[in-house]
UniProtKB/Swiss-Prot annotation:
Name under which the protein is recorded: M-zodatoxin-Lt1a
Short motif (Processing quadruplet motif): ranges: 59-62
GO molecular function: toxin activity
Keyword check for DNA-binding: no
Function summary: Has antimicrobial activity against Gram-positive bacteria (A.globiformis VKM Ac-1112 (MIC=0.5 uM), and B.subtilis VKM B-501 (MIC=1.0 uM)), Gram-negative bacteria (E.coli DH5-alpha (MIC=1.0 uM), E.coli MH1 (MIC=0.7 uM), and P.aeruginosa PAO1 (MIC=4.1 uM)), and yeasts (P.pastoris GS115 (MIC=17 uM), and S.cerevisiae Y190 (MIC>33 uM)). Has a moderate hemolytic activity against rabbit erythrocytes. Causes paralysis, but is not lethal when injected into insect (M.domestica) larvae.
Organism expressing this protein natively: Lachesana tarabaevi
Lineage: Eukaryota, Metazoa, Ecdysozoa, Arthropoda, Chelicerata
UniProt keyword terms in alphabetical order: Antibiotic, Antimicrobial, Cytolysis, Fungicide, Hemolysis, Secreted, Signal, Toxin
Length: 88
């Protein structure tokens, strides 16, 4: 009987220790879900970057950038003309 009480006390002690130091399963699942959502976000960002790289090589992109530079250079040319006319 004495051994039974000691074994029972040890079992209860081990259960209490395991209960107090165990990780919460829900918390682990939430962490895994966060990791999955982060991975999904990173995958989407990688796809968007790839699409952007493809866009930069397209004819539409080149015409957009050339149009932007053309407008900017035209604006600078007009500003230079105004400045030169004002100095004369």
């Amino acid at each position: 009987m004495k051994y039974f009480v000691v074994a029972l006390a040890l079992a209860v002690a081990l259960v209490c220790i395991a209960e107090s130091t165990a990780y919460d399963v829900n918390e682990e699942l939430e962490n895994e879900l966060d990791d999955l959502s982060d991975a999904a976000w990173l995958a989407k960002a990688a796809e968007d970057l790839q699409a952007l790289d493809d866009f930069e090589e397209s004819e539409e992109s080149r015409s957009m950038w050339s149009g932007m530079w053309r407008r900017k250079l035209k604006k600078l040319r007009n500003a230079l003309k105004k400045k030169l006319k004002g100095e004369k």
